Amino acid sequence: MKIIVKLFGLLCIAGGIALFSSPMIATENIKQETKQYITQFKQKEEKNKVNKEDDPRYLEIEEYNEKIYENHQKDFRDVNSYQSSPISLKGFKDGKFGYIKIPKMNVKLPLYVGASDSHLASGAAILGQTSIPVGEIDTNSVIAGHRGYQGAPFFREIEKLDKGDTITIVNPWDTLEYEVTGIDVISPFNTDAVMIQEGRDMITLVTCHPYRSGGKYRYIVYCTRKGTKPSRKGNESYQLLKTSTQDINNEDNVRRGGALLLAFLFLSALAQEIKFFIQESRYKKRSKQL
């Protein structure tokens, strides 16, 4: 019975270590999944490579981008429309469009068309009724990401981004580099803040704010393609609102501290059991000799 109790205690400590370490495990998992996604994406596009001007997928995207610009994104009002894919994109399996790299956040994620729950659980997603990024003016691709999801970071560290930082979009035809030009915090219903800006080639990152707030506000990062006209948007007063940096740091410190403490307790208990086992073995050996 004593042995069972001790084993149960060790298992509880090991379970605690796994719990506190789960964010690191989740982060590593998403990195491996993204690596596999990118490899498959590159292999597929290399195999089917054609000039973009001759690619039906590209022509369909051009037509769509032009249409929503000309109609002033009139359907960009219904929350459900954000989740659905804006166009069929028959050549893109499961909405896969490429990937996004954000060096300042140490993030590389699959990029999907349509912000469905499944897409957002796997990477970043382009909101329906916003532009698809192919390097054209009069476009603004609004790209959403979770502020952390099941332990993986996704857009959790978005507040690390500053003006001038680079964000890269890799689509089937081009690698497009964008520069952060403005930051703001808005209401979830303020679609006007993320509309297309005439004469500009933009992407806008969006995630919940503050961290673990349940989506009270949206943290917005405006980015303009390098070498093109910068965004008119941005609001320096956003810094007066609550920042999540300290909350994120505190959470990380608690997780690391908890994992280290439990690891110490586990190793101490294990060392004690090993010591007891060795002493007991020696005692039995001496008893036999007598």
Language model features with spans:
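C-terminal single-pass membrane-anchor helix
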Residues: 240-290
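Solvent-exposed, non-transmembrane regions of membrane-associated and secreted proteins
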Residues: 2-250, 275-279
